[in-house]
Amino acid sequence: MHFVMSYDLKAEGTRRADLEDKIEAILSPYQHVKRLSAFYVIKINSEKEWEELRLALNSFASDISEEFHYIMTSPNKEPGKYNGILYRGDWDEINAITVNN
């Protein structure tokens, strides 16, 4: 099972780096890959984990003064197919999450 999450964060410089480290910490228990500037493909084992991540991101947004907006797709139990232009190895990491649910 996997889903996609993307966000906008209105912060710059070292503050942005610090906040992005906190986002990575929220995601760290889960296998995930970051593609593009703020686009993640995340593997989860249950819809409960999806909800836990959603609540953690909401809490993160409430705890900071900067604007933080995000979108999470619904959990997908089927193998995913994504298209676009990335480096070849980038697709291997995405497929490891989306194809081998």
Question: Language-model segments: which ranges?
Answer:
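Short, surface-exposed beta-edge/turn micro-motifs
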Residues: 1-2, 36-39
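Short, extreme N-terminal segment that most often corresponds to the first beta-strand
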Residues: 1-14
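Short cationic amphipathic helices and targeting signals
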Residues: 5, 40-43
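Charged interaction segments
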Residues: 20-24, 28-31, 36, 43-101
